Amino acid sequence: MSKLLAKIGVGGPPLPSRVFLLGVEGIGKTTFGATAPKPLFITSEDGLSEFPGVERFSPDTWEEITGLVGELLGQDKLAYKSIVIDTADWMERMVYQWVCKDAGTDDINKAYGGYGKGHDRATAELVLFLRHLDQLRAKHNTRIIILGHVHIKAFTDPAGEAWDRWEAKGNKKFAGVIREWADSVLFATREVHKIKRADGSGEKAAGGERVIHTTWHPGFDAKNRQSLPATLPLSWDAFAEAEGGSKPENLIERIKTIYPLVRGSMSEEDVAAWDERLKNLEDVSDDRLRTAISILQEIADSE
């Protein structure tokens, strides 16, 4: 057998998908990440205040972020199953500050003599960082989730049509690198539809359920590589189940993940009842486990 043929092999088990979740402020992006399996948030100092039970790392510099990922890579066993970066536009600012410091300027457009060289350096640093996240994912079977804010931008199609659409905040090239890297780009919004008024005077908006879109639309960007439904409820459990199904042990783990996050907002009576339920989850049917998750998720979303 030749040396080249000897290198042919088969792929290993699938790794957790890489997720880029976009949405307006307050839609529930942080809740989505906080209810992922055993998350560690990399976030700003004031991020995640509504989830005191979730572990977080609040860096002051880009060097601290890359240093943390390096230390996590060096661990033989990782306590976290998900790494959540909150948010992409905050991370971009950290990278730009690092580039400006290295270039001896306070303006990214003047870094290294200008002409886009500062942006190019920032993009190259992001590519390297995502590569390190991929190494972490491969070594520890860790899911990587990046959250991002959006804003409305005018878009002109080459064919001549023009319209407004939601786009990731920040530098377009920077966000584009994350989009290409991610397995799933999800857009979170509220599903609103029109219904006729009871008095027949016209139509009114109704609905308002929070959802995630998984496929491209003229009004927003989205994609997935897992053949997901085009629209899902905005919850970690709905996404995980659509992605690969939830095994009973995963349902129990989800309850044990979400419950500590919302326990502090419950009455003493409810806490006592839930504490008792958690003692015998192995004997509970899958349907009842999913109902329990839905109840806990609603409490989390309302906070």
What kind of region is each of these model predictions?
Residues 2-18, 27-29, 35-36, 40, ...:
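Interfaces that engage single-stranded nucleic acids at replication/repair/recombination sites
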Residues 21:
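Hydrophobic anchor at the beta1->P-loop junction of P-loop NTPases
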Residues 35-37, 52, 181:
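Short, structured coil segments at secondary-structure junctions
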Residues 39-41, 144, 185-187:
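Short, well-ordered beta-strand core segments
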Residues 45-49, 89-90, 150-154, 191-194, ...:
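Conserved nucleotide-binding/hydrolysis micro-motifs of P-loop NTPases
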Residues 49-116:
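Conserved nucleotide-sensing/catalytic segment adjacent to the nucleotide-binding pocket
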Residues 90-174:
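P-loop NTPase motor core
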Residues 155-253:
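Conserved GTP-binding G-domain of TRAFAC-class P-loop NTPases and closely related GTPase folds
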